[in-house]
Amino acid sequence: MKKVYIKTFGCQMNEYDSDKMADVLGSAEGMVKTDNPEEADVILFNTCSVREKAQEKVFSDLGRIRPLKEANPDLIIGVGGCVASQEGDAIVKRAPFVDVVFGPQTLHRLPDLIESRKQSGRSQVDISFPEIEKFDHIPPAKVDGGAAFVSIMEGCSKYCSFCVVPYTRGEEVSRPFEDVLTEIAGLAAQGVKEITLLGQNVNAYRGLMSDGEIADFALLLEYVHEVPGVERIRFTTSHPREFSQRIIDCYAKLPKLVSHLHLPVQSGSDRVLMAMKRGYTGLEYKSIIRKLRAIRPDLCLSSDFIIGFPGETEADFEQTLKLVRDCEFDFSFVFIYSPRPGTPAANLPDDTPHAEKVRRLEALNEVIEAKGYAINQSMVGTVQRVLVENVSKKDATMLAARTANNRVVNFAGHPRLLGRMIEVKITAAFPHSLAGEALTSESA
């Protein structure tokens, strides 16, 4: 039986796409996944170009597997994802042993690209943007667990000045409404209890319905809520510009919509937000959070921040710190600005020393982590309903589960609980996780 090894970089959308690569090759070629590249017949890198470090790591990894190709010329090596879209033929020029290069929108063509490579003896490159075609060619997912991702739209039309996504994944294109619901119903029939709706700007969803009308994201949430078997709904990543009152109202009327929201703000400075072309102010962002917390006081909030954007002053950074304290984020992802070729921001002058950017990053992380730890500590003694996801990475005798507000809870339990929703009592808090004890018997 042939085997495929897939290494994934970057976002949850890439994780979803990697699963679909495996599904496509499994259906067309009978391949199964392996965690060992040395035993693989096909090695794929699903890449990310959001930051320079992630992009360069791909080429480092390609260099490390080159000896495998030299030892086995029949080994197929492929590069997909956003670096593939951005670099195209340049990847083959830099690493001539790469056999196939494909973009996020052409992963469904992998079997044909591999066959063309074998027949022609030449590297194959397909980084076109055939919009939503790939979903028509991907076989139904077979899942092993209680949670699953469902991509509902692709691309981004916001063109933030720092971001490569519109250039690597194309503009916003939404999947048809009924197609999304059919996929979710199929997953629920396989025992999936938690659905995470995915998109670069997931709340910009505008899906065509069978009657010719257009469904917005709020309507999709309402329909997903009614799918039998679905107990939890998450979504990521959303954009503040698209966070309508209709979506806010969903938090009041849809109990399956979890009390966790990832809403990237990037900066608390209006001047920086304008330079980033984000399309909102810090006050407008805080207004969204205020409305949500009036409905869901227990809302867990996470975000993304870019530190050291060109021209960011100490005063700008202080405004970011103030926004963080005002919004009380549970956790966030903080990065030093990384200029991406081809974006407007790449040409902006940047005179802030790197050491100062590091200082700001550490200061912001300190504030965010202190608040997150305090929230974790406040959960000790409470009973939480969790979805048991996997065996703990640190202790094979422990299970790892996730609360509705996105906390990882480690507890002693039998693997037969995997994929189930159970109740646990929180017994201890740590900076990035919780400990608990199961209140549900293993045979219940």
From Swiss-Prot:
Q: Does the keyword Protease apply?
A: no
Coiled coil location: none
Its GO CC terms are: cytosol
Q: Which cofactor does it need?
A: [4Fe-4S] cluster
What PROSITE patterns does this protein's entry cite? Answer: MTTASE_N, MTTASE_RADICAL, RADICAL_SAM, TRAM
Which GO molecular function annotations are given, in alphabetical order? 4 iron, 4 sulfur cluster binding; metal ion binding; N6-isopentenyladenosine methylthiotransferase activity
Query: What is catalyzed by this enzyme?
Result: N(6)-dimethylallyladenosine(37) in tRNA + (sulfur carrier)-SH + AH2 + 2 S-adenosyl-L-methionine = 2-methylsulfanyl-N(6)-dimethylallyladenosine(37) in tRNA + (sulfur carrier)-H + 5'-deoxyadenosine + L-methionine + A + S-adenosyl-L-homocysteine + 2 H(+)
Please share the entry's free-text remark on the cofactor: Binds 2 [4Fe-4S] clusters. One cluster is coordinated with 3 cysteines and an exchangeable S-adenosyl-L-methionine.
**Which residue range or ranges hold the TRAM domain?**
377-440
EC number, as in UniProt: 2.8.4.3
Protein residues bound to [4Fe-4S] cluster 1: 11, 48, 82
Q: Where are the transmembrane segments?
A: none
Q: Which family does it belong to?
A: Belongs to the methylthiotransferase family. MiaB subfamily.
Q: How does it assemble?
A: Monomer.
PANTHER family assigned: CDK5 REGULATORY SUBUNIT-ASSOCIATED PROTEIN 1, MITOCHONDRIAL TRNA METHYLTHIOTRANSFERASE CDK5RAP1
The function of this protein is: Catalyzes the methylthiolation of N6-(dimethylallyl)adenosine (i(6)A), leading to the formation of 2-methylthio-N6-(dimethylallyl)adenosine (ms(2)i(6)A) at position 37 in tRNAs that read codons beginning with uridine.
Query: What is the name listed in the Swiss-Prot or TrEMBL entry for this protein?
Result: tRNA-2-methylthio-N(6)-dimethylallyladenosine synthase
Organism annotation: Chromobacterium violaceum (strain ATCC 12472 / DSM 30191 / JCM 1249 / CCUG 213 / NBRC 12614 / NCIMB 9131 / NCTC 9757 / MK)
